[in-house]
Amino acid sequence: MIKRRYLILLLLPLAMISLFVGVGEMSLAGLWAGNPQDWQLFWTSRLPRLMAIVVAGAGLSVCGLIMQSLSRNRFVSPTTAGLYDCARLGVLVSIILLPSASIFVKTGFAIAVTLMGAMAFMSILATLKHRDTVFVPLVGMIFGSIISAFTTFIALQMDLLQNLAGWLQGDFSTILNGQYELIYLSVPVLILIYIFANRFVLAGLGQDFATNLGLNYKQTLFLGLLLVSVITGVVIVTVGAIPFLGLIVPNLVSLYLGDNIRRTLSHTALLGALLVLFCDVFGRVVIYPYEVSVSLIMGVVGSVIFLWLLLRRYRYAS
């Protein structure tokens, strides 16, 4: 596996490229000369977009890592556990109950409904006698489809479907200074995940084993789901859904570094940020001057890698 410093060395030049790629003209020479238009574009759009990409990519990748540990299944993530759909339902509820609600209130509703959905998903898993590698995420995707269908039905009845369009896919083109800072809430949550990483490792061993080791399993499970829900809710409200990210990145890292969360956490965050940044830059240049959303590119890349992971697991299992 690529060492941490190599991931950073890949991330830095790609971040520099990201700052200077886009429809608006901005150059290093212009910044050096103090061109006010270049600096305005830098502070208003390019830097906020870069920061949002890095934080969202790192956050969602780590969410997948925690979900996989708590569910004891390699293919569980916010995408395959229906958490994105729950977050969108939370946003819809906030729009219905409080039409003039601020983004902070919408985020609060998104986090609350995501947490309830995550707890419901884990409760469903607890009733399953056979936790097959593929069957568990299939259950999660069915659960998410039910939530999504319910959300769409309510939105249609309330004539609010158009209001939800912005949260259906991840898109960083609308990120501007003063409209994205809420995503920074993910940073202290990531720090908390690192602090409690060992507890999540023990929880991933199963309730009986973890309890015998002195761990309060239910408390740790709730804490993990809460932290995942906060990041998921914040990212959904700020930039929208980015499919498969939390599924493929932890799997790619664990192939080489194992399942110790504390050991793989930084690699997972860096690789997630790097992958989203690459997809964003590619989306900006592939049909320039138009843009392809990150969620579309990530959906294609993620589905291919997901299929490869499935085939690889079955090949080695046989």
Predicted regions and their residues:
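Alpha-helical transmembrane segments in inner-membrane proteins
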Residues: 1-318
